[in-house]
Structure formats: C-alpha cells, structure tokens
C-alpha cells in the first residue's frame, strides 16, 4: 500500500464565494445540470450541508471505473471558503483506495476571480497505479465548467 498526496491550483474568473457555493456546497445539484455527460445525478444522503453531511454523486461516464461517489463533509468554513471531504463509499474505495480526503480552498484574487487550491491525500491499494494526473484534470474540468456556468448566469449563487 502506498500513501500519497498532491496539490493543484486552478485560476478562475469568478469570485471565491460564488465558486465555493456552486462548486462545493451545491455541486450535487449543479453538476448534473452543467455536465450531464459526466454526472447523472446527486443528492444529500444525510445531513444539512454542515460538517458530517454525506452527499452522493452518480457518475454517467463509462470511462470512469466506478458509478458513484459518496463523500462526507469533514470541515466547512463559509467565511474562508474552505471544505474538506472524505470518500466514504464508491469512487474506487476498496478497489483503488483504502482512504482518500480532499481539501478545497477558494482564495480571492486581485482581478475579482479566485484561485482554487486543492490538496488530496490518499492510500492506494497494492497493484493500483497512481492516477493523480487524471484526478487533477478532473478537478480542473469541474472548476472550469462551474466557472463557465457562473459567467453565463451572473445572478446565480450570489
């Protein structure tokens, strides 16, 4: 078993608060609307969006080796636009990973947009290749899809 971590940054032209709300807090609702070829649906399994909430995202892409992801919110800071989540089911848990957590922070930038900083930590099961490059690409696609939606809908998530 191998432990690993990576960090990634994505610059977007949308304010940190709007990106945080859309890409993190409401992604289970927004994702299926803006990337239906990738996300079939989403829901809150338990909780109210605060720490301890469990959300499920159903994947609609045959290139992804799992059909859903369930994640638990471990930390949410609405003032600093931060969230930490842990994979609790699906998403390769037990097949690719022993465990995985992801920390997102949306930092305001001087141009009115923000810098999305992501740090992932995980334990890969024996014989499984580290696919962090694909994960980073997925994060970039997630943020850029959210950015495009918010730029096209300036009153959304205000």
UniProtKB/Swiss-Prot annotation:
<dbReference type="GO" id="GO:0005737">
    <property type="term" value="C:cytoplasm"/>
</dbReference>
<dbReference type="Pfam" id="PF00407">
    <property type="entry name" value="Bet_v_1"/>
</dbReference>
<keyword id="KW-0568">Pathogenesis-related protein</keyword>
<dbReference type="InterPro" id="IPR050279">
    <property type="entry name" value="Plant_def-hormone_signal"/>
</dbReference>
<dbReference type="InterPro" id="IPR000916">
    <property type="entry name" value="Bet_v_I/MLP"/>
</dbReference>
<dbReference type="GO" id="GO:0004864">
    <property type="term" value="F:protein phosphatase inhibitor activity"/>
</dbReference>
<dbReference type="InterPro" id="IPR023393">
    <property type="entry name" value="START-like_dom_sf"/>
</dbReference>
<protein>
    <recommendedName>
        <fullName>Pathogenesis-related protein 1</fullName>
    </recommendedName>
</protein>
<keyword id="KW-0963">Cytoplasm</keyword>
<dbReference type="GO" id="GO:0038023">
    <property type="term" value="F:signaling receptor activity"/>
</dbReference>
<keyword id="KW-0611">Plant defense</keyword>
<dbReference type="GO" id="GO:0009738">
    <property type="term" value="P:abscisic acid-activated signaling pathway"/>
</dbReference>
<dbReference type="InterPro" id="IPR024949">
    <property type="entry name" value="Bet_v_I_allergen"/>
</dbReference>
<dbReference type="GO" id="GO:0005634">
    <property type="term" value="C:nucleus"/>
</dbReference>
<dbReference type="GO" id="GO:0010427">
    <property type="term" value="F:abscisic acid binding"/>
</dbReference>
<comment type="similarity">
    <text>Belongs to the BetVI family.</text>
</comment>
<dbReference type="GO" id="GO:0006952">
    <property type="term" value="P:defense response"/>
</dbReference>
